[in-house]
């Protein structure tokens, strides 16, 4: 019996559909997409895949970085999961060899496993959210807490981090999906970051951040996940890439990504 389910979430994309057999070798597969997706793409999904066709929503609430879309499709996909573990992947990305990632999820069930793509050293509480894995319960609770966290924000609002109790001195200035998921995941572990860091010096904060992330996250490098496609669609500079297929390219990219949690 398989112990992990890959939940491919988001609008259907040929890139992830053609990679489904690679996921199937390791576990079950659920595709959670939208009822507005191309019928031709639905026909390409193998019969062994569970498909969740969500009614497309035009959210009137906060949806910066499409966070509400990501939460909606992932949670709806989780409802169809019959295994104790889940790996969430974006529908516009793929990884051809997930053995190391899945092994990490199995070996460290009380952690959340992520990749190093855009896992930035410069900003605290900003782990990558492109692919993540863990127990079904932990991932679901993280997403539910995230919905609560963004519940009072407006549709097109960009939220300054000060509004959630953090500071631009050490975090990204705008509340991102990555930060929302991080604070929410730590909350599932009984960790209240905002309360904990009150009155800390920068040195104490840096030590707290590294210790907290290392105790609750595991990292698998993209170079250990076979051939891959990772997107950076929000890149505002048109002369720069919006996708990466080589780890060294994004390690050299000016935004920066770590190779190990020891770099934090």
Language-model-detected regions and their locations in the chain:
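Short, well-formed alpha-helical segments that are part of the catalytic scaffolds
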Residues: 12-25
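Acidic donor-binding/catalytic loop of UDP-sugar-dependent glycosyltransferases
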Residues: 71, 91-105
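Catalytic core and acceptor-binding pocket of nucleotide-sugar-dependent glycosyltransferases
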Residues: 95-98, 112-262
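Short aromatic/hydrophobic "clamp" motif used to bind/position activated sugar donors
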Residues: 86
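Active-site acidic Asp-centered loop
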Residues: 34, 89-91
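N-proximal low-complexity "stem/linker" segments adjacent to membrane-targeting elements
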Residues: 1-15
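Active-site-proximal specificity loops/subdomain of glycosyltransferases
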Residues: 32-80
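Short, polar loop motifs at secondary-structure junctions
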Residues: 11-13, 33-40, 116-120
């Amino acid at each position: 019996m398989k112990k992990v389910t890959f939940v491919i979430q988001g609008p259907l994309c040929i890139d992830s559909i053609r990679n489904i057999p690679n996921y199937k070798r390791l576990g079950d597969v659920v595709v959670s997409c939208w009822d507005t997706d191309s019928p031709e793409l639905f026909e390409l999904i193998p019969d062994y895949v569970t498909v969740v066709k969500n009614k497309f929503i035009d959210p009137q609430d906060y949806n910066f970085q499409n966070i509400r879309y990501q939460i909606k499709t992932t949670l709806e996909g989780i409802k169809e999961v019959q295994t104790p573990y889940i790996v969430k992947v974006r529908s516009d990305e793929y990884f051809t060899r997930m053995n190391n990632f899945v092994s990490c999820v199995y070996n460290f069930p009380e952690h959340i496993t992520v990749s190093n793509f855009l896992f930035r050293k410069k900003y605290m509480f900003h782990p990558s959210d492109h692919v993540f894995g863990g127990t079904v319960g932990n991932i679901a609770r993280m997403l539910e807490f995230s919905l609560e966290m963004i519940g009072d924000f407006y549709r097109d609002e960009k939220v300054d981090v000060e509004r959630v109790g953090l500071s631009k001195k050490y975090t990204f200035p705008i509340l991102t999906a990555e930060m929302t998921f991080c604070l929410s995941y730590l909350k599932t572990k009984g960790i209240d970051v905002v309360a904990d860091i009150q009155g800390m010096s920068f040195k104490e904060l840096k030590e707290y951040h590294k210790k907290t992330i290392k105790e609750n996250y595991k990292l698998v490098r993209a170079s250990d996940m076979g051939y891959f496609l990772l997107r950076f669609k929000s890149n505002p500079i048109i002369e720069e890439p919006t996708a990466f297929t080589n780890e060294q390219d994004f390690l050299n990219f000016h935004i920066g990504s770590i190779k190990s949690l020891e770099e934090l």
